[in-house]
Amino acid sequence: QEAPKAFNQCQACHKVEAGEDGVGPSLFGLFGHKLGQAPGFKYSEAHLKFAQQTVDEPFLTKYLADPKASLPGNKMVFAGLKNPDDVKAVLAYLKTIK
């Protein structure tokens, strides 16, 4: 599946290939895993504090819309996707990256 236009903001820092980190960790196989699990990536204390959080649709819906409110203290500079259709498109795309 082709990445939606809204995903361009994510690609500024994240890669979708397994084990290929950018400024942020790879998003490959993100769904169903716990936060802060990409091997070798140095996560913020905020991500480590929420390391038991499973990355699922309810969590990512909130996180993509407002990362700072969903995960206080995280280092991501991304302000969030304000359009709910963009959030849905990015979620659908992320589910295919595995």
Swiss-Prot record:
Intracellular or extracellular location(s): Periplasm
Organism encoding this protein: Rhodoplanes tepidamans
Protein name (record): Cytochrome c2
Pfam families: Cytochrom_C
Molecular function, one GO term: heme binding
InterPro entries, per the entry: Cyt_c-like_dom (IPR009056), Cyt_c-like_dom_sf (IPR036909), Cyt_c_1A/1B (IPR002327)
Superkingdom: Bacteria
Binding, heme c: C10, C13, H14, M76
